[in-house]
């Protein structure tokens, strides 16, 4: 209704319809003039999602204003613009959520800039890092995701459409382009793309693919925190409260819920995006298949994902003592590279690497520390 009213005002300013008609349409652009029961009854007769609504709305318009409602537009003009406004609202929520997540990650990173832990590659202890270093990668990725959403938002803001069934402005005539611009401004959107996109869905596909990419960022965080909360590691904890139940049969369980949900979202959203991507393939100027419902679904799922991430980061506990303890599990072997490069300046890199490798393997075999193995160089054939 707001779109039809914006269209009427834009047309009135161009002299396409009378000013009084635009005022009447705007005045009656309220849901109470389109009761659902009447719309449902009308739809049983006309079998058209928009015409049924327009017919009911027209009953409330006076002095012949109904003749100018939906003047020169087509159904997809209205519903595609509705979709644009919905996605714009969704983007606003998502960007706000990512900014909140950015602030939470920034605090988490600052608080743990000196929280030492084992850096792991391919599931093995590799080199020492800090937990703040780990979360700084989440922070940087989240910032890039904010910029990605803002870039998509600019394109969505230009995607209002009033070009008619085949993109020629035939219903509006020579004033079509200017009327479309004025309607877009009335709706708080940007300068519309000149090219018709009823059958060109790349902007919506980019929106969906951006959400898919963002879901993988959160999936990575969820997977990491699931692993770090393992009984054998225990370096982080999603603190759901003392009374929280992890299992109906195992009282000791503290299952990570938020992390698992993030991983699940990272699987669902990319599958949804594939449907929207497929919708780019259209026959002629416009085809029948539409992914509008999937666009709504993916937007709702994305908002559930960011809400989950916010709750998780607010509830996250970092077990610094456990991280320090786990750092020493290898009895100092995690520092073998540092020792290698210290010796490299004395005996050469290749010789040092060969020597420390043999020492490290000896330490593992005999279950002694790296420092003890180095002290006992007589055990190693150099």
Predicted regions and their residues:
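Glycine-rich cofactor/substrate-binding loops
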Residues: 1-3, 42-46, 248-380
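A helix-coil-helix interface module used to build multimeric assemblies
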Residues: 1-163, 167-169, 173-182, 191, ...
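Amphipathic alpha-helices that form helix-helix packing interfaces
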Residues: 3, 7-10, 94, 98-101, ...
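Active-site-proximal structural scaffolding
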Residues: 50, 135, 176, 200, ...
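Proline-centered turn/helix-capping motifs that create local helix->coil transitions or kinks
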Residues: 61-65, 150-157, 230-234, 270-274, ...
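Short, well-ordered beta-strand elements within core beta-sheets of diverse protein domains
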Residues: 133, 205-213, 338-346
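Glycine-rich anion/phosphate-binding loop at the beta-strand->alpha-helix junction
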Residues: 145, 197-288
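A short, charged helix-loop
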Residues: 182-198
